[in-house]
């Protein structure tokens, strides 16, 4: 999500850091900033909300002493805690103005740490989780067993933090030193000649060096102009072979921005394990599901007697999946509406209605107007959004942010999986408030969600045959997608992706409707992709869809079946079988969607189209 750069060496750090931030603009951001260690033992911090040009204007006004120091940090922020404002932009510094930090990720236990610091008299200058880290390091550096030892102070604080994070610190009292660390979120080191770099990715330093190290899990590094020392969070540097990865960068800058992938969309598909994991982070605290911005009490949620979900495009498909989960867990009736239709049909809304509005950008015009219509009718409105501080969350009663990070590809991929995850969290929050799930049941469902990132990664690791399959069907005039239950919205999403990216005719159908018309389309060599339900979830649905597969195969179609590992009953009827791990019924879309994303992208590539920028489409639709 956020872009991080750190530099220590012989060159003026300001110029190096600002150039690095420009190279990392592709990551997306809502604010940016720099911390510069001056030659006179002081620290200068400059930060601005909005475009990087705003920061460049501010930096141009800095005194000459701030422009000549040779140690500095830079940051582009994608907001998670606190709105995208100047005061919440990074870097953050301690009260003495000596120590600065930049941060990517989430500190899950920040609320308790902040309370502890405030009890000690520390005053906070922002609404972020990040600021607790710099105040804790400042305390450790000035008092106690690590006093005067910058690196040891950082390590002592790291051991207290929960969550997924990358943290990079600079200290005006030790101007030639940077201390950085990572847990789960990426961090790479660039090894130069008399200079060292650290960044979120190699774009931070690729013009300066091609020699790099990827830090391992729960590792820290101390950087000086002369070299580096890597340790675990306990300070041990005897880490053994393979603890971190040394590599040479062969990519050019354009490839580095895409992480070595040909297109941003392919990179974003690969980022889906992190998108799901980050969306879950911090939402289960003391045995309860919590939202990011909760202005609805449990009593107000108990008063809800019906739910509407409003969204457009891919977000609408995630809303269809929300219906299955919310109805199953809460026994509340749920209607899913296209936002563009919702306010024009005079839906029945009142104070007992909860409207869930899903939007990646938070600016989707149809969804925004649906939110305003719901508010006019006194309904309660909850937003699921990927962009902190955008318009839709500002107008809602509660917010749950998907933390998928910036999505450059126009066709949504990682935000779709993050939206499904967020929808399920909303369902569990409602069940918890209404008492339709016992606390241990809510906890069990949450932990099942927590296991999904690893399973998503497993699917991604075995997906190559899908790309090869796409080559065979790249020139097909049409492709049909079939599913039942939660497989039906997945079929709709698969068809949409193929239409968006490959400009092919594709349709998704509920398999039970096959005999009511779509079977007339079946002919020789027509590719039909089937999302098979788990035989353990519903034996009846499984048997019925198996019957559908036999019907279409008997009419000459080519069957491409996505089924759970070990489902041998489907094998005789699948011309091509794509296997995914076995999970509970509601969680299957988080896995079965991935082959369809890869299939659509691969077909588009085979047809010679730009996967990132499909024709006639925009990432954020801000007009009706």
Curated annotation (Swiss-Prot):
Function: Catalyzes the first step in hexosamine metabolism, converting fructose-6P into glucosamine-6P using glutamine as a nitrogen source.
Reactions this protein catalyses: D-fructose 6-phosphate + L-glutamine = D-glucosamine 6-phosphate + L-glutamate
Keyword vocabulary terms for this entry: Aminotransferase, Cytoplasm, Glutamine amidotransferase, Repeat, Transferase
Annotated ranges, domain SIS: 297-436, 469-614
Subunit structure: Homodimer.
GO molecular function ontology, one term from the record: carbohydrate derivative binding
PROSITE patterns per record: GATASE_TYPE_2, SIS
Taxon lineage: Bacteria, Bacillati, Actinomycetota, Actinomycetes, Mycobacteriales
GO cellular component: cytosol
Localization of this protein: Cytoplasm
Enzyme class: transferase
Name listed for the protein in its UniProt record: Glutamine--fructose-6-phosphate aminotransferase [isomerizing]
Domain Glutamine amidotransferase type-2 span(s) in chain numbering: 2-226
């Amino acid at each position: 999500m956020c872009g991080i750069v750190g530099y220590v060496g012989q060159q003026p750090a300001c110029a190096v850091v600002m150039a690095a931030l420009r190279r990392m603009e592709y990551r997306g951001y809502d604010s940016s900033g720099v911390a510069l260690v001056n030659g006179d033992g002081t620290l200068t911090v400059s930060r601005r909300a909005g475009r990087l040009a705003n920061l460049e204007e501010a930096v141009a006004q800095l005194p000459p002493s701030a422009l000549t120091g040779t140690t500095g940090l830079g940051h582009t922020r994608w907001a998670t805690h606190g709105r995208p404002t100047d005061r919440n932009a990074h870097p953050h510094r301690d009260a003495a103005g000596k120590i600065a930090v930049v941060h990517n990720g989430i500190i899950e236990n920040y609320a308790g740490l902040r309370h502890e610091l405030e009890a000690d008299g520390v005053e906070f200058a922002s609404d972020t989780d990040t600021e607790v880290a710099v105040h804790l390091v400042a305390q450790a550096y000035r008092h106690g067993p690590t006093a005067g030892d910058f690196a040891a102070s950082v390590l002592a604080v790291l051991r207290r933090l929960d969550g997924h994070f990358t943290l990079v610190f600079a200290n005006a009292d030790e101007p030639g030193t940077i201390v950085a660390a990572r847990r789960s979120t990426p961090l790479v080191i660039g090894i130069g000649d008399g200079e060292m770099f650290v960044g979120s990715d190699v774009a931070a330093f690729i013009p300066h060096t091609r020699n790099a190290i990827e830090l391992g899990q729960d590792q820290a590094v101390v950087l000086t102009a002369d070299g580096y020392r890597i340790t675990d969070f306990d300070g041990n540097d005897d880490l053994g072979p393979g603890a971190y990865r040394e590599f040479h960068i062969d990519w050019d800058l354009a490839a580095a921005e895409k992480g070595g992938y040909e297109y941003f969309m392919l990179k974003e598909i690969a980022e889906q394990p992190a998108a799901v994991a980050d969306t879950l982070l911090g939402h289960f605290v003391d045995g309860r599901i919590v939202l990011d911005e909760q202005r609805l009490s449990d009593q107000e949620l108990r008063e809800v007697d019906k739910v509407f979900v409003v969204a457009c495009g891919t977000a609408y498909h995630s809303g269809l999946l929300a219906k299955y989960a919310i109805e199953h867990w809460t026994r509340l009736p749920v209607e899913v509406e296209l936002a563009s239709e919702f306010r024009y049909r005079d839906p029945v809304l009142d104070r007992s209605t909860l409207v869930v509005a899903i939007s990646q950008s938070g600016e989707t015009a149809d969804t925004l107007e649906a939110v305003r219509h719901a508010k006019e009718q006194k309904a309660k409105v909850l937003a699921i959004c990927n962009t902190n501080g955008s318009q839709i969350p500002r107008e809602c009663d509660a917010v749950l942010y998907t933390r998928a990070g910036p999505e450059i590809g126009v066709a949504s991929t990682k935000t779709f999986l993050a939206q499904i995850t967020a929808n399920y969290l909303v369902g569990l929050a409602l069940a918890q408030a209404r008492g339709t799930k016992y606390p241990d049941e809510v906890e069990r469902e949450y932990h099942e969600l927590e296991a999904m990132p690893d399973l998503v990664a497993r699917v991604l690791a075995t997906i190559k045959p899908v790309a090869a399959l796409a080559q065979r069907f790249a020139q097909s005039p049409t492709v049909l997608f079939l599913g039942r239950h939660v497989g039906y919205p997945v079929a709709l999403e698969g068809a949409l992706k193929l239409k968006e990216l490959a400009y092919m005719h594709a349709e998704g159908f509920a398999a039970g409707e096959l005999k009511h018309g779509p079977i007339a389309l079946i002919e020789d060599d027509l590719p039909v992709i089937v999302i098979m339900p788990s035989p353990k979830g519903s034996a009846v649905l499984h048997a019925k869809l198996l019957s559908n597969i036999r019907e279409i195969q008997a009419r000459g179609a080519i069957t491409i079946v996505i089924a759970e590992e070990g489902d041998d009953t489907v094998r005789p009827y699948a011309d091509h079988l794509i296997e995914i791990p076995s999970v509970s019924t509601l969680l299957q879309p988080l896995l079965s969607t991935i082959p369809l994303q890869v299939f659509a992208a691969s077909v588009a590539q085979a047809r010679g189209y730009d996967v990132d920028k499909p024709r006639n489409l925009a990432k954020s639709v801000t007009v009706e």
